[in-house]
A protein has these predicted regions:
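Alpha-helical protein-protein interaction modules
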Residues: 1-187
């Protein structure tokens, strides 16, 4: 209507709506965090994280906040039957949650690899620490190590590929012998 009257449209409503969407996304992610930390409601957390990431993809892409990683932990835990709200999940829903966990971990792994390519000296230590944590995190016990044998073959292969790629990135980030100072001989 304003344009029809020859007046320029204000961009303020669009900016306010975008700011509200970002705030809603942040709030949704924070609620997901609360579901995990205080309520052990992992399935609910996954839904909150999914909606928050869809509304503001930057929330998922921030490696330092570990939000996408924590969302993957929630999905893996719910898929394993852990948490207050996991009892109602059927096999199909558990498989979907495992796939969601895999997708989120794969996205983070790709982002860490890109960071290593762009800033190897700066990222190396964080990557080594993070990849070691992933390998040891009990949240993924049902999709790692010997537990992989319990998964359907196609799913098992995808998870094994993730763990293999994770180890490859960890090794790539590890200090190379030619970069390490040579020990001095003592007389």
């Amino acid at each position: 209507m304003a344009k029809a009257l020859g007046r320029p449209r204000s961009a303020a409503p669009a900016r306010r709506a975008a700011a509200r969407t970002d705030a809603d996304a942040q709030e949704g992610a924070q609620l997901g965090d609360l579901c995990v930390q205080y309520k052990k409601r992992y399935d609910a957390a996954v839904r909150l994280y999914t909606n928050a990431f869809a509304a503001d993809p930057k929330l998922a892409g921030d490696l330092r906040s570990e939000r996408r990683y924590n969302a993957a932990c929630s999905a893996a835990l719910a898929a394993a039957g852990d948490g207050e709200d996991a009892a109602k999940l059927d096999a199909k829903e558990r498989a979907r949650l495992r796939q969601q966990a895999l997708t989120w971990l794969r996205a983070d792994l790709t982002a860490w690899a890109k960071l290593l390519d762009q800033q190897p000296d700066k990222a190396r230590r964080d990557i080594l620490k993070t990849m070691q944590h992933w390998q040891q995190d009990a949240d993924f016990a049902h999709v790692h190590g010997d537990s992989l044998a319990k998964l359907p073959e196609a799913e098992r292969k995808k998870w094994q590929k993730l763990w293999d790629d994770l180890e490859a990135l960890r090794q790539r980030a590890a200090p190379q012998p030619e970069l390490m100072p040579t020990p001095k001989e003592e007389p």
